[in-house]
Amino acid sequence: VINAKTEAVPFLAITRPNYFSVIAVRADSGLTNAEQLKGQTLSMSDIGSTSGHLGPSKILVDQGLDPQTDLEVLMLGDAELQALKNGDVNAWGGSYIDYERFLEAEGAQESDYPILFEGEMLPSDVLMASKNLDPALVTEITEKMLANQDALIAAITSVDANQKFVGSELVAVQDSDYDSIRESYQAIGVNEFTEFVGD
């Protein structure tokens, strides 16, 4: 979407440890495969969230399900895992990190909320350069950021809201690295990558 709006060029990305989505159920659900998810209710977090909406939707498609027609997806924000615990939904799709935090908060084990499917690692958070910048300058900026990445990551993670980047690193990136996100948009019925989905 950024590319479509600005023609900006990706030049680096910041990785996120354990940045992938999962589909989980309650241990007593009786659900063990994709076919059994048909006709069920599944909670997710927020519309447009990479790990909380796009990632789980892509998992469903990869398992042969249409998230728009084969099951009822409920976007419940921060209440999505509580809905699974309460039995208000049959399954949940979202960030593996959120899943880990939920288990810890509940004093639960993975066997209490088994993971049915695990998605691929989601693309790293991208850094973009204006199309108007001299490519030589972009190269120089890239080299300096890579050479000083320990200090940059330390500065980023010094903020409480950025703890998701603890253990991250700066890596080279290209536009095709985000094809999986384009496929995720298509999984939720969006085929034009000109506007962000959600808030």
Enumerate the predicted regions with their spans.
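Short, charged, surface-exposed loops that flank catalytic or proteolytic processing sites
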Residues: 32-33, 140
